[in-house]
Amino acid sequence: MIKLRLKRFGKKKEASFRIVACNSTSRRDGRPLQELGFYNPRTKETRLDTEALRIRLTQGAQPTDVVRTLLEKGGLLEKKVRPSIAIGKANLEKEKIAKAKSKESESANKEAES
């Protein structure tokens, strides 16, 4: 299976990454099948070879999570709703509302007692 993943290069503690297509069993920094782009997390610079990426995606290459987000930002993939994140946010909102209601009811009870 072909994966689209990041290949690290650069100085120590100043990493940059190349977006590459490689076999899923190969090493992270091993020889890739094709270089498809560049990503620098320090400057947020991203360069994508859109034509080559489209070809690899139509051939069935699977992007890793980080590469998927870069492709979504680049407009090559539709944004995927991650259910665990959406569910987590919904649960947090419900908890906030429940806490606010309980505080209101406690303050109402204290006022009624006095």
From Swiss-Prot:
Record-linked PROSITE patterns: RIBOSOMAL_S16
Q: Which UniProt keywords apply?
A: Ribonucleoprotein, Ribosomal protein
**Cross-referenced SUPFAM superfamilies:** Ribosomal protein S16
Keyword Glycoprotein part of the UniProt annotation:
no
Q: Record keywords: Zinc included?
A: no
Q: Which InterPro entries match?
A: Ribosomal_bS16, Ribosomal_bS16_CS, Ribosomal_bS16_dom_sf
UniProt superkingdom: Bacteria
A GO cellular component annotation in the UniProt record: small ribosomal subunit
Give a GO molecular function annotation for the protein. structural constituent of ribosome
Which GO terms are recorded in the biological process aspect for this UniProt protein? translation
What family is this protein classified in?
A: Belongs to the bacterial ribosomal protein bS16 family.
Q: What is this protein called?
A: Small ribosomal subunit protein bS16
Native species of this protein?
A: Prochlorococcus marinus (strain MIT 9515)
